């Protein structure tokens, strides 16, 4: 596995947090704990099962043995080899990492975007990095990723020494399209999903069969739980590729909790354009220009 790049003492003293965001570095300076590290009240934890596509109640919990469908998640394990993983991270580490919120560092390859005003600029954007060409080509070989053409790549670097995390959030839907694709490198972690919608989730007995047998094995719902009290954990092995679509992309917020970063982790997220920038869309010409630049694979971090 790729060795983690050493960080200087100066880097571990620097902080990129703003507003309510914090990391271990600024918390030591402030002498406070982040509120999201405290156990949330009335939260029931479920674990996503990639074999069935269901979220299953954790062992020894009130909902052990109960589950609900969790569509919109595709997990491809061993998408890259250990050797490819090491080379990808080595190439990333040749370029500078910028400090970011909540103990993260980042490298961005994409247009400059003002999401609030829904405006973007292509100045300075010269494409995705050359080392992503093979990654993008390989994605298109998998069902569900046909025709996936990313116009933005964001590399995020997490490490336990900085207390890296990312708060629950939904990715923008004005510019970014239906499929959100992330490559998890260097260490396993957990993506935590939550939903703030009112109402309840209907639970069934947890399925134990293969997906094609679920129709016959699942009984009618007989329990329910409030959406706002549920968190679904999606385990992400190192070198795995995660695709979020549908409800998992647009309705469930995703986060990485600090406690789930036990070693250096690099996440590479790829985003495609929304329909507004696609064929027949209001900004089709701009979308074509963004694709032309992105898929030249001549980029450096912006």
Curated annotation (Swiss-Prot):
Subunit (UniProt): Interacts with ZFHX3, MLLT3, MLLT1, HSF4, EP300, TES, EIF3C, MTMR6 and PSMA6.
GO terms under cellular component: contractile ring; cytoplasm; midbody; nucleolus
Keywords: Acetylation, Actin-binding, Chromatin regulator, Cytoplasm, Dioxygenase, Iron, Metal-binding, Nucleus, Oxidoreductase, Phosphoprotein, Transcription, Transcription regulation
Keyword flag Translocase: no
Residues noted as binding Fe cation in the record, renumbered to the chain: 169, 171, 254
Listed name of the protein: Alpha-ketoglutarate-dependent dioxygenase alkB homolog 4
Record EC number: 1.14.11.51, 1.14.11.-
Lineage, uppermost ranks: Eukaryota, Metazoa, Chordata, Craniata, Vertebrata
